[in-house]
């Protein structure tokens, strides 16, 4: 009887121990799945419209006006009339409806001797009203290489222009001798939009 009692007690203790043990299951961590974007013809861009908007294009051109004499005078008209830069006038501008020149650097490169005298005056005409220089305040010395930068606001570059119309003009006039003085090197940045 005693032996049987011990067995009953042992079984009861084992049963209680089994009931007290927590059940632990090892599970793999669940990672949230990212939805892959499907690229297809029927997908719309974020703008909400059914087509992709084309942003404006930026172009840079460098051209020169050579064989300037000390007494040369003339003008450079920026736009479709810019014959000094065929890639712009006969190229890019014919491929778009609108353009905007945003930056201009006019550099004078001297070729004159150190004993030469005189200067070349220049003037910005943002409204294309003048054909000859009106003011000679701003000038380059014939014997010194210099450059001048014009801001976007100064060159009428805050609005878009039709590619059939010019934007602005730079006039110049020298007061030196009729000898080769140097050349102009012009760098411009042009925005275009609305391709033809």
Curated annotation (Swiss-Prot):
UniProt-annotated location(s): Virion
GO-annotated molecular function: structural molecule activity
Pfam family, one: Luteo_coat
Region (Disordered), start-end ranges: 27-55
A single GO cellular-component term on record: T=3 icosahedral viral capsid
Composition bias type Basic residues, residue spans: 32-44
The keyword Manganese is annotated on this UniProt entry: no
Keyword list, A-Z: Capsid protein, T=3 icosahedral capsid protein, Virion
Additional note from the record: The N-terminal region like those of many plant virus capsid proteins is highly basic. It has been suggested that these regions may be involved in protein-RNA interaction.
Free-text function comment from the UniProt entry: Major capsid protein.
Protein family per UniProt: Belongs to the luteoviruses capsid protein family.
Protein name, UniProt field: Major capsid protein
Organism this protein belongs to: Bean leafroll virus (BLRV)
């Amino acid at each position: 009887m005693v032996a049987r009692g011990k067995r009953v007690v042992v079984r009861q203790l084992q049963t209680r121990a089994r009931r007290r043990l927590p059940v632990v299951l090892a599970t793999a961590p669940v990672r949230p799945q990212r939805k892959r974007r499907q690229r297809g013809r029927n997908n719309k861009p974020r703008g909400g419209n059914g087509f992709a908007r084309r942003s404006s294009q930026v172009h840079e051109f460098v051209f020169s006006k050579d064989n300037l004499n000390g007494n040369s005078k003339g003008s450079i008209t920026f736009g479709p009339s810019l014959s000094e830069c065929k890639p712009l006038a006969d190229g890019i501008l014919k491929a778009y409806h609108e353009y905007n020149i945003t930056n201009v650097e006019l550099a004078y490169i001297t070729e004159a001797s150190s004993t030469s005298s005189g200067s070349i005056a220049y003037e910005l005409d943002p409204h294309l009203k003048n054909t000859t220089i009106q003011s000679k305040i701003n000038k380059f010395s014939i014997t010194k290489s210099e450059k001048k930068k014009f801001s976007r606001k100064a060159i009428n570059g805050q609005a878009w222009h039709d590619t059939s119309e010019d934007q602005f003009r730079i006039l110049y006039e020298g007061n030196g001798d009729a000898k080769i003085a140097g050349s102009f090197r012009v760098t411009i940045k042009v925005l275009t939009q609305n391709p033809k």
